[in-house]
């Protein structure tokens, strides 16, 4: 159970970081 929770937590963190970087790059391009 703990392993699954940790896996989903890591996946969510990776997705959040990727989205943040993608949005950041788009803002830089707009500027």
UniProtKB/Swiss-Prot annotation:
Membrane topology, from the record: Single-pass membrane protein
SUPFAM superfamilies listed in its UniProt record: PetL subunit of the cytochrome b6f complex (SSF103436)
One Pfam family recorded for the sequence: PetL
Highest taxon of source: Eukaryota
Keywords attached to this entry: Chloroplast, Electron transport, Membrane, Photosynthesis, Plastid, Thylakoid, Transmembrane, Transmembrane helix, Transport
Subcellular location: Plastid, Chloroplast thylakoid membrane
Transmembrane portions of the chain: 4-24
Signal sequence annotation: none
Gene Ontology, cellular component aspect: chloroplast thylakoid membrane; cytochrome b6f complex
Function of the protein: Component of the cytochrome b6-f complex, which mediates electron transfer between photosystem II (PSII) and photosystem I (PSI), cyclic electron flow around PSI, and state transitions. PetL is important for photoautotrophic growth as well as for electron transfer efficiency and stability of the cytochrome b6-f complex.
Subunit structure of this chain's protein: The 4 large subunits of the cytochrome b6-f complex are cytochrome b6, subunit IV (17 kDa polypeptide, PetD), cytochrome f and the Rieske protein, while the 4 small subunits are PetG, PetL, PetM and PetN. The complex functions as a dimer.
Family under the similarity heading: Belongs to the PetL family.
PANTHER family listed in its UniProt record: CYTOCHROME B6-F COMPLEX SUBUNIT 6 (PTHR37266:SF1)
Protein name according to UniProt: Cytochrome b6-f complex subunit 6
Source organism per UniProt: Coffea arabica
């Amino acid at each position: 159970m703990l392993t699954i929770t940790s896996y989903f937590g890591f996946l969510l963190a990776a997705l959040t970081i990727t989205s943040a970087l993608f949005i950041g790059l788009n803002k830089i391009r707009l500027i």
